[in-house]
Amino acid sequence: MERRAIIDIGSNSVRLIIYKINRDSTFKVLNEAKRTIRLGSYLTENDYLADNGLDILLKVLRVFKSICERYDVIEIYVVATEAIRRSINKNDLCNKVK
């Protein structure tokens, strides 16, 4: 069974869902995690995501990556909401996340 994960980076929290896809195309959630980091509060008046906010996000993503490795996840999908879409340095953030 293939195992995949979704990471949702929101303005207030980062969520992880790990699931397995069964042969009949159904899926089962294996693990869920959530960290509240209030990423939106690290956006400056000019919509720049401050370095300390980025550092906190990267720490959470490293933890989530290690959880995914323990579950033998073959693919991780990352989506981001308002705080990331609005930030003028989102390309830098995306490169660091990769």
Question: Which sequence ranges carry the predicted segments?
Answer:
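Nucleotide/phosphate-binding catalytic cleft detector across ATP-hydrolyzing
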Residues: M1-I9, I17-K98
